[in-house]
Design a protein with these regions (language model features):
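C-terminal beta-strand-rich structural cap/linker in extracellular carbohydrate-active enzymes
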Residues: 192-215
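Solvent-exposed beta-hairpin/edge-strand motifs
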Residues: 173-187
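Conserved alpha/beta catalytic core and glycan-binding cleft of carbohydrate-active enzymes
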Residues: 1-88, 126-154, 159-170, 184-185
Length: 215
């Protein structure tokens, strides 16, 4: 949670093959709640803003699920559920995201964007699980600028993200030259250098792959 609220934090613990790693569980506050309650601000950028919180939830999911090893999603994390664990008491009934008396998450366009991002990220993971398991994994996950690189014969990936609250520049380390694609937008670029400086707004992240999505 420290990383997503904008206070720094190392997220390398998700790279584990001996146990299931997770961002949320039954006995911890939700990431969304932590961001809304304790998020850091800088100028006009405020992690406590609901829309910004949801954008950062997408970024967190990319950096969690695209590290090697088994992963868990705690219920409704894919919708950026942000109700406190202590609402109505620790074991009290919590509002559901659906139904006439629920939170309306499934009718909320922005919550659905989070759901769709989770789905796409997990699709990428599942389609390239051999690469995540057998490929060369490199990462820098302790600062506000974070990066993951996977280098495998059949699949290569570079993920960059700004977990801070101010615009910053990261040097993206691509494992090979040639054509690369932004996973979400499909935008292509031809690399002549493996180390590329990229300006990132706060909360901005990109997943680059050497194959266009769906190919």
């Amino acid at each position: 949670a420290q990383a997503l609220i904008g206070a720094g934090g190392d997220i390398s613990g998700a790279n584990a093959s001996t146990h299931v790693s997770f961002m949320e569980s039954h006995d911890e506050e939700r990431q969304g709640y932590e961001m809304i309650e304790f998020g850091v601000s800088s100028g006009d950028y405020d992690v406590q803003n609901e829309l910004i919180m949801m954008e950062r939830a997408k970024m967190g999911s990319a950096f969690h699920f695209l590290q090697p090893g088994p992963k868990m999603i705690w219920q409704f994390g894919e919708l950026a559920y942000d109700i406190s664990i202590n609402q109505e008491g620790r074991l009290g009934e919590k509002p559901e995201p659906w139904g006439s008396e629920g939170l309306g998450y499934y009718e909320d366009t922005y919550r659905q964007y989070v759901f769709d991002a989770y789905s796409a990220i997990l699709e990428l993971r599942n389609e390239n699980i051999d690469a995540l398991t057998e490929g060369t994994f490199s990462s820098s996950l302790s600062g506000s600028l974070k990066q993951i690189t996977i280098d495998h014969t059949d699949f290569k990936m570079c993920i960059i993200g700004n977990f801070g609250t101010e615009t910053n520049t990261i040097t993206a380390n691509f494992p090979e030259l040639g054509d690369w694609f932004d996973y979400f937008t499909g935008e292509s670029m031809e690399l002549e250098f493996s180390n590329v400086p990229v300006d990132l707004a706060p909360g901005e992240f990109h997943i680059y792959t050497n194959n266009i999505r769906g190919s």
